[in-house]
Amino acid sequence: MIIVKLGGSVITDKSEYRAFRKDVTARLAREIGSSGKDVIVVHGAGSFGHIVAKENHLQDGLSEEGQIPAAARTMCDTRELSSMVVEEFLAAGIPAVSVPPGSCFVMEDGKLIVGNEETIRRLEGLGIMPVMFGDVVADRGRGFGIVSGDQCMSAKDRKSVV
């Protein structure tokens, strides 16, 4: 199994809020599909995650109630981006589905803790490519935190410590 990272600055224009680079993503999906390899895709949040998260200091965890709507907006936006990425893989003939990190991972005081990866393993077993992404996730100590696409990649094969 190969894990491929699609950088957020590659699939979005990070200078413009929610600017998806459909043509670039479609080309990457075709190239990944033509490789014939079993792949898990992890993508960055780009302009769908970084702008609102940075403006509201979400990376520091919950410090004021006003951050909650921003955390929810960021989660909604990153899921929308992931859906767009998945659509490009489907258009390229690759069965793919978005797997939000919050469904597999939890953080504790800013540190990623690997949780239940059964969903990912079962999708792989069915021949469906999991697509994960950087996102806001629950944090046991801070309320919420930011998990990056890179953290998803490095955590993929670690054993659970939950």
How should each PLM-predicted stretch be described?
Residues 57-136:
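Ligand-binding beta-strand-loop-alpha-helix segment within the catalytic cores
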Residues 129-131, 136-140, 144-157:
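Conserved mixed alpha/beta catalytic, RNA-binding, or beta-rich assembly cores of soluble enzyme
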Residues 10-12, 46-51, 104-107, 137-139:
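Short, active-site-adjacent cap segments at secondary-structure transitions
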Residues 17, 46-62:
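Glycine-rich loop at the start of a catalytic domain that most often binds anionic cofactors/ligands
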Residues 159-162:
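Conserved small/polar residues in nucleotide/adenosyl-binding loops
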Residues 1-40:
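N-terminal glycine-/serine-/threonine-rich phosphate-binding loop
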Residues 19-26, 113-118, 145-153:
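Charged helix-capping and loop-helix junction motifs
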Residues 3-7, 42-43, 99-100, 131-133:
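Short beta-strand segments
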